[in-house]
Amino acid sequence: LRKLKSILLVDDDETTNFLNKFFIRQLDNDLTVNTVTNGEEAIEFLEAVPYKKHMPCLLILDTNMPIMNGWEFLDVYEKKFDKDFKKNVIIVMLTALDTEAVTAMAMSNPNVTDTAQKPLSDLKFRVLINKYFS
């Protein structure tokens, strides 16, 4: 397992981003936590970020957002980034509804590593981080 260096929160709800950032800070104060409010901003952020400095990265992706939603983000992400980049990004797709259909759709995408139901808690973050990172 690799050591987690950064988390990118992609959600149009500022309150959700604030709370998630708070939970993460309680777990590990050394982590770099960035927030963007839609998929388009996430793509721009990932293109601009100095690759090595922030990898590996945990990307928490909401499904429903304006401008570019989570599904559209995944389509652009697939085309824009190479395999070496993608192997260092763990994408967890957030679902507001715990439906098998949404989970199955997310998990059928090769770039999605896991799904989680909103809202996240400090316990859910701890489980996700421990599952994929040392």
Could you describe each region identified by the protein language model?
Residues 120-129:
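C-terminal output helix
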Residues 65:
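Receiver (REC) domain active-site loop signature in two-component systems and cognate sites
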Residues 50-60, 89:
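Active-site beta3 strand of CheY-like receiver
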Residues 44, 71-85:
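Short amphipathic alpha-helix used as the core "switch/output" element in two-component signaling
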Residues 35-44, 48, 70:
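Helix N-cap/capping motif at the beta->alpha junctions
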Residues 12, 92-98, 119:
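Conserved active-site segment of CheY-like receiver
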Residues 72, 87-89, 97-115, 127:
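Alpha4 helix (beta4-alpha4-beta5 surface) of REC/receiver domains from two-component response regulators
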Residues 5-16, 20-24:
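Conserved acidic segment of CheY-like receiver
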